[in-house]
Amino acid sequence: MNHLPIRSSYEAPLPISLTGSAVALVPLAASHGDDLYALSTAKGAEDRFRYLFEQVPTPESFEQFMIKACASKDPMYVAVIRKEDGRCLGRQSLMRITPDHGVIEIGNILWGPDMAATRMATEAFFLHACYVFDTLGYRRFEWKCNVLNGPSRRAALRFGFRFEGVFRQHMIVKGKSRDTAWYGMLDHEWPQIKQHFERWLSPENFDGKGSQKTQLRAGLLSL
């Protein structure tokens, strides 16, 4: 295993904006509330919130969530903004931030109906991954989810994380016992993973209807 040199220190993430070709990640703010509440309560909300820590929000609970989330430094929330029209299509966060060890996790992901399973979702993840490895220089990027959450587990593998095991009876969430599946990505793995993302996200990989020509997962399987 080719470990990279360990730094003497790692910086904590800052509330900055990250811009891609289709989406931008910006610090979560009250101005994103209307769009986020609409997508949080749109058709299929029960499915989107099934494995999140929160329930489908009411106006009151959403207001309290936004107050806490906008002020939080860990998790550090961002809104996912579609550059085409400036709409907020989802949110995600960097969390379990551990500068002493150069370890960080992506989580609290809520991608709305217009964004989930699209090129925009892939780019939103990629922007955070680039920030974690290329800007902060962290050693380890984590993804974890309920072991029953099939879509999240498939997404982790598609994005290049490696499955590392299950913590049994790890949490109690919404009154139920949760076994947690853990996934990790390491700094020395990132350069090759990044190349596959860049090729997949390039305009040449999409036809006139916006459909992908090659799958991201197919490329990552060869690593």
Regions found by a protein language model. Name each.
Residues W143-S152:
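Conserved beta-strand-loop-alpha-helix junction that forms the acyl-donor binding cleft
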Residues R158-G160:
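Active-site-proximal glycine-rich helix-loop-beta segment
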Residues R162-K176:
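Conserved catalytic-core motifs of GNAT/GCN5-like acyltransferases
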Residues M1-T118, Y131, T135, K176-A181, ...:
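GNAT-family acyltransferases
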Residues A155-A156, Y183:
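Conserved active-site tyrosine of GNAT-family acetyltransferases
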Residues A121:
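Glycine-rich acyl-CoA binding loop
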Residues D134-K144:
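Conserved GNAT acetyl-CoA-binding A-motif
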